[in-house]
Amino acid sequence: MNDLNIWKRAERIRKLLGEDSSSPIDLFALTNSINGLSIVNYPMGENISGMCVKGKHSNVFAINSLMTLGRQRFTLAHELFHLYYDNEPSTSICLKNIGAGNEKEIQADQFASYLIMPPLALTEMIQKLKESSSGVITLNEVVFLEQYYQISRQAVLYRLIQERELSHQDAEKMRQNIIQSAINLGYDDTLYKPSPLNKRYRTYGHYIKLAEKVLEKGLVSRGKYEELLLEAFRSDLVYGEDIDEEILD
């Protein structure tokens, strides 16, 4: 499959999710609207970024909560490729290194990159950045791009190398002191850290909605409903944990 076809597929998913073809997107919010999809945050070690498990009536994405928030967003986009365009019915396990693995995994990484950073929009953004930085992409521009699109340093460097805006040698220098480079430019460091401890085991989406639905219909008792939530690592919904004071503003 060539890059143009992957680009077109990424555009279709943007449209399916109700987004335009150029703006930054919040994939965690958007995927909550996909029928039958549950997303599970779970620590998986350092070599696996995520999994896609497809079923007859529902699907599950498992996202490695030990990876940075920026990488989790990229992984979520990667899993959307497996959900919509991978004809294999089995579970897909996705590796940490972007652009590695079999042909299907490489396509999924390319799809994720195009979904989050649409080619035309990225090209226009790069040109604007280069105009204000002596015609080259420096570390400052890399930090801006990862903050603008809310993805990891590795994902941004991977794409800039593909676009021939960075050499492998220059990119390698930018893999160091990632958090410090962002803080020095005035950015918050949340993007560069794993999920908070209280959210490293957590389920969102279809499973939670379904549990609520069967309770409302009287198909399960309150005790069973709470048991279902606890099995999905949602003690916060059972015991009211981690709920901040509400502010209507």
Annotate each language-model stretch with its function.
Residues 1-249:
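Active-site hotspot residues in diverse enzymes, especially metal/ion-binding acidic/histidine motifs
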